[in-house]
Every structure is written in structure tokens, then in C-alpha cells.
Amino acid sequence: MSLSEPKPHAPTPDTAQQRTPVTLKALARMAREGTPFACLAAYDATTARWLERGGVHCILAGDSAAEVILGLPRTAEMPLEVSIALTAAVKRGAPNTVIMADLPFGSYHESDEQAVRTATRYIREARADIVKLEADASFSSTVAHVTRAGIPVCAHVGSLPQRAALTSGYTSAGRSADAAIEIIKDALALEAAGATMLLIEAVPPLVTEALLARTRIPIIGIGAGTAAHGQILVVNDLLGLTDAPPRFAEPAEALGARIQAAGQTWANRVKERNIGGQAYTMPAEQADLFRNRLAHLDETTRDKPSS
């Protein structure tokens, strides 16, 4: 099978256009009914369009773009303006999918008012459906203010990538009884503050199951077992584009190797002057006219004295 040949089961643009829009209410209904929903973090319109066609219910325009798109060393370095632009691109690519904005580090920490201003920009400028922020119980007031402004909030608990600098790198969470209890307390406080949804990251499945039994809002898991209402991965990890993916991220494809092979094929084609495809043509009479005019141009240029 060639790189350009679609797999037999791949959705076509015609069938993709028939998709019913997914909403936050639809995700809540799926959670109540015990139907898992699929989420992925993605960062551009083209990828978002294909994910929507593939049936993904929610796309997070994650601050992980700092690393996988911008090449920065940490998610905490994600620029706000770039994040808003990428979120808007994802929304344009997948208009019938729930789009979750990821508030960057420093864009909501100064005050509740700053958080409302930042969240409002994502809703207005990027047309996001919901905003996500990394939080513990101390951010309950922030969640309450943003929610009171009419903006749905997904509270991110467990392992918090934006705080990696405090933990000397990305790490799991909730692996001791005390740590697990703190995560449960955080989540309950954030739900009480008005969070529409929770995302729990890199915790033992036991912690996720305990949280599910004590909350009434949808929970998305990443590296948190299989029990959560929804599951999310970074699309680069799913596609095999990451050199060292997290232990919980099993690739569904090996696109990194295929992209590398395609690059090698193109380099060889260019070297051999055999780039493929079809060249544009010129009608014979126009080609003759062009040659005549080109000869005249050459003669005129040749006779022109040099300065």
C-alpha cells in the first residue's frame, strides 16, 4: 500500500460531512449512559479535520504544542497568543467536535479576573467550547469565577505538566495513599466550584475509580486506567511521531517512520530529477510564439550596452 493510498476503512470526505455535531451535553449524556468518548490533543486544522472524520468526540488544543509543535523544552513555555491561534485553527478544522482550549501557564495564575479575561479570549477569538486549566483545591475560586462568567471549565488534576519544573520533570501522581487522597479532595472541591468536567492524568486506576464513585461530572483520563468516561492522548503519540512516548501511550500507527521514508523517497526523486506528477503544458502555437519572443528578448539583451 502506497503512502497516498487510503486504508479500506478510512472515512471519506462525503461521509464525514454527515456527522452530527458533538456538544458538551452530548458528552455528559454519554458519560451517564456509560458510553466512552474519544478525545485527542491536536494543534492544526488539517489534523483536526481528519480526527473529526474519524469519529473523535473532543479535541484538546493542548499546551503540549509548546513541545511537539514549537520545539520548546516545556509546556510551561507555551505563548498565549500562539495557543489562541492554534485553538482557532483546530476549531476551523473540526467545527462539529467539542474543542477544549488549554490555558497556558501564567495566563490564569495572577488572579481570578485574569483567568476570566484569558478564558473569554478563547471563547470569543478561538470559538472554543470549554477551557481547561491545571488546578488543585486552591483554584476553586478561579473555577467559580470562570464558570460564573458563563464559560465551561475542565479542571485538570493528578499529574500537572505545567508544574514539571517543581518536580524535576514529568512524573506520575497519586501513588501513595496521602497523595491519592489529596487528588480526590482537589477534584471534589473543583467540582463543587462549578467545573463542568475533570481530566485526571497519570494516576493509578484505583484513584480514577474512587473519583468516579464520588463525582457526577464527566471524567477524562490520560494514563489513568480504562474506567474514565473519556480517554485522551496526544495525537503525536498515537500516530507514532514521538521518539519516546509516555508508558501509557500505545501508538496506533508508525507515521514517524513513514514520514522519514517519504522524505528519503523525495530526496532521491529530486536527485534523479524524477519528481513525478504531471507538468503543466502550453499549446503548441503558444510554445512557438514563446520561443520566438524569447529569442528576440535574448537578442535585445545581448545588443544592449552594459553599464
Language-model regions, residue ranges each:
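Alpha/beta enzyme core
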Residues: 2-307
